[in-house]
Amino acid sequence: MEETNRQKKIGGLLQKDLADILQNSLRESGRTGILISVSKVRVTTDLSIAKAYVSIFPSKHQEEVIKEINENKSQIKHEMAQRTRHQLRKMPDLSFYVDDSLEYIDGIEKSIKGKEDPVANPDLLDKRKKS
């Protein structure tokens, strides 16, 4: 089902504010060398739940940063509610997920360019089939 205009607008608003809050919290905690971005926010049709997909670079810090974000979810929700109090009546419940789409794309590119190229070597297709 396609998102409505309202869902898209709220998702964009939440995405912008979430990115700002998460980057500020990383800066305040003294963690340097970690880049965090909110790649997508999907809001349910009743606007009660928002799923935020977060990209973290370098990827070796993904698990600990997501764990830290989930531990501070209530504080993040409160700050989001303060920022969006004039646009939203009720702040949706937030859930955070690691966005691994860039790694997935990178894996596809490596398999095409690397030695496991199924186009150049059709024998590899038999290995990839699910039994």
From Swiss-Prot:
Keywords: Cytoplasm, Ribosome biogenesis
GO BP terms in the entry: maturation of SSU-rRNA
UniProt subcellular location: Cytoplasm
Superkingdom in the source lineage: Bacteria
Keyword Cytoplasm listed: yes
Cross-referenced InterPro entries: KH_dom-like_a/b (IPR015946), RbfA (IPR000238), RbfA_dom_sf (IPR023799)
One term of GO molecular function: ribosomal small subunit binding
GO cellular component: cytosol
Family annotation (Pfam families): RBFA
Family, per entry: Belongs to the RbfA family.
Known partners and oligomeric status: Monomer. Binds 30S ribosomal subunits, but not 50S ribosomal subunits or 70S ribosomes.
Stored PANTHER family: RIBOSOME-BINDING FACTOR A, CHLOROPLASTIC-RELATED
Function: One of several proteins that assist in the late maturation steps of the functional core of the 30S ribosomal subunit. Associates with free 30S ribosomal subunits (but not with 30S subunits that are part of 70S ribosomes or polysomes). Required for efficient processing of 16S rRNA. May interact with the 5'-terminal helix region of 16S rRNA.
Protein name, per record: Ribosome-binding factor A
